[in-house]
Protein backbone atom coordinates (compact mmCIF):
# COMPACT_ATOMS: atom_id res chain seq x y z
CA UNK A 1 0.00 0.00 0.00
CA UNK A 2 1.54 3.30 -1.10
CA UNK A 3 1.13 6.18 1.36
CA UNK A 4 1.92 9.81 0.56
CA UNK A 5 1.60 12.27 3.45
CA UNK A 6 2.01 16.03 3.79
CA UNK A 7 4.23 17.59 6.46
CA UNK A 8 1.51 17.94 9.10
CA UNK A 9 0.24 14.40 8.51
CA UNK A 10 3.83 13.16 8.92
CA UNK A 11 4.08 14.91 12.29
CA UNK A 12 0.69 13.68 13.52
CA UNK A 13 1.35 10.08 12.49
CA UNK A 14 4.81 10.17 14.08
CA UNK A 15 3.33 11.43 17.35
CA UNK A 16 0.63 8.75 17.41
CA UNK A 17 3.23 6.01 16.97
CA UNK A 18 5.62 7.57 19.49
CA UNK A 19 3.03 7.93 22.23
CA UNK A 20 1.71 4.41 21.71
CA UNK A 21 5.21 3.01 22.31
CA UNK A 22 6.65 5.51 24.80
CA UNK A 23 3.61 6.39 26.96
CA UNK A 24 0.94 3.72 26.36
CA UNK A 25 -0.91 4.80 29.52
CA UNK A 26 -1.94 8.03 27.71
CA UNK A 27 -2.77 6.34 24.39
CA UNK A 28 -4.96 6.71 22.30
CA UNK A 29 -4.54 10.50 22.33
CA UNK A 30 -7.10 13.26 22.71
CA UNK A 31 -6.93 16.15 20.26
CA UNK A 32 -5.45 18.33 22.99
CA UNK A 33 -2.74 15.82 23.87
CA UNK A 34 -1.97 15.15 20.21
CA UNK A 35 -1.58 18.86 19.45
CA UNK A 36 0.74 19.21 22.44
CA UNK A 37 2.79 16.27 21.20
CA UNK A 38 3.02 17.74 17.70
CA UNK A 39 4.29 21.06 19.06
CA UNK A 40 6.75 19.81 21.66
CA UNK A 41 10.32 21.04 21.34
CA UNK A 42 12.11 17.83 22.28
CA UNK A 43 12.56 15.02 19.76
CA UNK A 44 11.16 17.14 16.93
CA UNK A 45 12.78 18.53 13.77
CA UNK A 46 11.48 20.92 12.71
CA UNK A 47 9.69 22.33 15.76
CA UNK A 48 6.12 23.21 14.78
CA UNK A 49 3.39 25.44 16.21
CA UNK A 50 0.23 23.78 14.93
CA UNK A 51 -3.32 24.85 15.75
CA UNK A 52 -5.87 22.21 16.73
CA UNK A 53 -7.70 22.87 13.46
CA UNK A 54 -4.56 21.91 11.51
CA UNK A 55 -4.23 18.70 13.52
CA UNK A 56 -7.90 17.89 12.83
CA UNK A 57 -7.35 18.33 9.09
CA UNK A 58 -4.29 16.09 9.28
CA UNK A 59 -6.30 13.45 11.16
CA UNK A 60 -8.97 13.61 8.46
CA UNK A 61 -6.27 13.07 5.84
CA UNK A 62 -4.81 10.12 7.74
CA UNK A 63 -8.28 8.59 8.05
CA UNK A 64 -8.81 8.91 4.28
CA UNK A 65 -5.45 7.22 3.73
CA UNK A 66 -6.45 4.44 6.15
CA UNK A 67 -3.59 4.90 8.63
CA UNK A 68 -5.45 6.49 11.60
CA UNK A 69 -8.91 6.31 13.16
CA UNK A 70 -10.91 7.57 16.12
CA UNK A 71 -10.70 4.96 18.87
CA UNK A 72 -13.96 3.05 19.26
CA UNK A 73 -13.86 3.15 23.08
CA UNK A 74 -12.80 6.81 23.41
CA UNK A 75 -15.76 7.73 25.64
CA UNK A 76 -16.87 11.34 26.14
CA UNK A 77 -13.59 12.82 24.89
CA UNK A 78 -12.65 11.58 21.39
CA UNK A 79 -9.26 9.86 21.15
CA UNK A 80 -7.22 8.91 18.12
CA UNK A 81 -4.83 6.13 17.20
CA UNK A 82 -2.89 4.90 14.19
CA UNK A 83 -3.63 1.58 12.48
CA UNK A 84 -0.33 0.97 10.70
CA UNK A 85 0.25 -2.27 12.58
CA UNK A 86 -3.10 -3.68 11.52
CA UNK A 87 -2.67 -2.69 7.87
CA UNK A 88 1.05 -3.31 7.30
CA UNK A 89 1.99 -5.72 10.12
CA UNK A 90 4.83 -3.68 11.61
CA UNK A 91 6.92 -4.99 14.48
CA UNK A 92 7.51 -2.69 17.49
CA UNK A 93 11.11 -2.22 16.31
CA UNK A 94 9.97 -1.14 12.84
CA UNK A 95 7.41 1.25 14.32
CA UNK A 96 10.00 2.83 16.62
CA UNK A 97 12.45 3.50 13.78
CA UNK A 98 9.72 4.77 11.48
CA UNK A 99 8.35 7.08 14.19
CA UNK A 100 11.80 8.54 14.83
CA UNK A 101 12.30 9.24 11.12
CA UNK A 102 8.84 10.84 10.90
CA UNK A 103 9.51 13.07 13.91
CA UNK A 104 13.09 14.17 13.24
CA UNK A 105 13.84 13.52 9.59
CA UNK A 106 17.00 11.87 8.21
CA UNK A 107 19.30 10.33 10.85
CA UNK A 108 22.34 8.07 11.16
CA UNK A 109 22.30 4.56 12.63
CA UNK A 110 23.74 5.85 15.90
CA UNK A 111 21.23 8.67 16.17
CA UNK A 112 18.34 6.32 15.50
CA UNK A 113 19.49 3.79 18.09
CA UNK A 114 19.90 6.44 20.80
CA UNK A 115 16.76 8.41 20.05
CA UNK A 116 14.44 5.45 19.51
CA UNK A 117 15.48 3.90 22.83
CA UNK A 118 12.52 5.52 24.60
CA UNK A 119 10.18 3.55 22.32
CA UNK A 120 12.04 0.26 21.75
CA UNK A 121 15.49 -1.01 22.84
CA UNK A 122 18.07 -1.93 20.20
CA UNK A 123 21.01 -4.13 21.22
CA UNK A 124 23.44 -2.56 18.76
CA UNK A 125 23.76 -0.67 15.49
CA UNK A 126 23.42 -3.90 13.54
CA UNK A 127 19.92 -4.35 14.97
CA UNK A 128 18.95 -0.87 13.77
CA UNK A 129 20.44 -1.53 10.35
CA UNK A 130 18.50 -4.78 10.07
CA UNK A 131 15.21 -3.01 10.77
CA UNK A 132 16.05 -0.30 8.23
CA UNK A 133 16.80 -3.01 5.69
CA UNK A 134 13.42 -4.63 6.31
CA UNK A 135 11.65 -1.30 5.86
CA UNK A 136 13.62 -0.59 2.68
CA UNK A 137 12.72 -4.00 1.21
CA UNK A 138 8.96 -3.52 1.55
CA UNK A 139 6.87 -2.86 -1.54
CA UNK A 140 6.87 0.06 -1.94
CA UNK A 141 10.01 0.89 0.10
CA UNK A 142 9.41 2.91 3.27
CA UNK A 143 12.97 4.13 3.92
CA UNK A 144 16.09 4.89 1.89
CA UNK A 145 19.78 5.49 2.56
CA UNK A 146 20.81 9.03 1.61
CA UNK A 147 24.11 9.91 -0.07
CA UNK A 148 26.69 10.80 2.57
CA UNK A 149 26.97 14.55 3.10
CA UNK A 150 30.31 16.37 2.84
CA UNK A 151 31.87 16.53 6.30
CA UNK A 152 29.89 13.61 7.67
CA UNK A 153 31.37 10.19 8.39
CA UNK A 154 28.11 8.26 8.29
CA UNK A 155 25.22 7.98 5.89
CA UNK A 156 21.75 8.91 7.04
CA UNK A 157 18.40 7.24 6.44
CA UNK A 158 15.08 8.89 5.56
CA UNK A 159 11.46 7.72 5.45
CA UNK A 160 9.55 7.77 2.15
CA UNK A 161 6.02 8.33 3.44
CA UNK A 162 6.15 11.90 2.10
CA UNK A 163 7.98 10.96 -1.08
CA UNK A 164 11.73 11.06 -1.65
CA UNK A 165 13.55 13.84 0.28
CA UNK A 166 14.97 16.86 -1.53
CA UNK A 167 18.61 15.83 -1.88
CA UNK A 168 19.68 19.29 -3.04
CA UNK A 169 18.39 20.72 0.24
CA UNK A 170 20.14 17.94 2.14
CA UNK A 171 23.45 18.86 0.54
CA UNK A 172 23.11 22.47 1.68
CA UNK A 173 22.64 21.43 5.32
CA UNK A 174 25.94 21.55 7.21
CA UNK A 175 26.46 19.19 10.17
CA UNK A 176 26.27 20.97 13.56
CA UNK A 177 29.47 21.56 15.54
CA UNK A 178 30.14 19.87 18.89
CA UNK A 179 29.13 22.83 21.05
CA UNK A 180 25.87 23.18 19.16
CA UNK A 181 25.11 19.48 19.69
CA UNK A 182 25.64 19.90 23.44
CA UNK A 183 23.26 22.87 23.58
CA UNK A 184 20.69 20.95 21.53
CA UNK A 185 20.87 18.02 23.96
CA UNK A 186 20.37 20.34 26.95
CA UNK A 187 17.43 22.04 25.24
CA UNK A 188 15.86 18.66 24.56
CA UNK A 189 16.06 17.66 28.24
CA UNK A 190 14.42 20.93 29.28
CA UNK A 191 11.75 20.64 26.60
CA UNK A 192 11.02 17.05 27.63
CA UNK A 193 10.30 18.20 31.19
CA UNK A 194 8.10 21.02 29.90
CA UNK A 195 6.19 18.54 27.74
CA UNK A 196 5.62 16.21 30.70
CA UNK A 197 4.15 19.09 32.71
CA UNK A 198 1.98 20.20 29.76
CA UNK A 199 0.73 16.64 29.21
CA UNK A 200 -0.18 16.23 32.87
CA UNK A 201 -2.00 19.57 32.85
CA UNK A 202 -3.95 18.54 29.76
CA UNK A 203 -4.95 15.23 31.36
CA UNK A 204 -6.05 17.02 34.55
CA UNK A 205 -8.12 19.46 32.48
CA UNK A 206 -9.81 16.62 30.65
CA UNK A 207 -10.56 14.81 33.92
CA UNK A 208 -12.08 17.99 35.34
CA UNK A 209 -14.29 18.32 32.26
CA UNK A 210 -15.52 14.74 32.62
CA UNK A 211 -16.18 15.22 36.34
CA UNK A 212 -18.11 18.43 35.71
CA UNK A 213 -20.25 16.71 33.08
CA UNK A 214 -20.86 13.81 35.46
CA UNK A 215 -21.74 16.16 38.33
CA UNK A 216 -24.15 18.14 36.14
CA UNK A 217 -26.28 15.01 35.68
CA UNK A 218 -27.26 15.17 39.36
CA UNK A 219 -27.91 18.89 39.63
Swiss-Prot record:
Top-rank taxon, per record: Bacteria
Segments forming a coiled coil: none
Family matches, as InterPro entries: DUF480, WH-like_DNA-bd_sf, WH_DNA-bd_sf
Similarity comment: family membership: Belongs to the UPF0502 family.
Matching HAMAP family: UPF0502
Name of this chain's protein: UPF0502 protein GSU0233
Amino acid sequence: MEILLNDVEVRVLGCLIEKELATPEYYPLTLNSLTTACNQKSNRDPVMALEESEVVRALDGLKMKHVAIQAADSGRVPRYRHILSERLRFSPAELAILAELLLRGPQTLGELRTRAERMHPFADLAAVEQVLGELAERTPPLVMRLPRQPGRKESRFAHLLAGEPDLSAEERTAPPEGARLQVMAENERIAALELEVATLRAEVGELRQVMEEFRSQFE
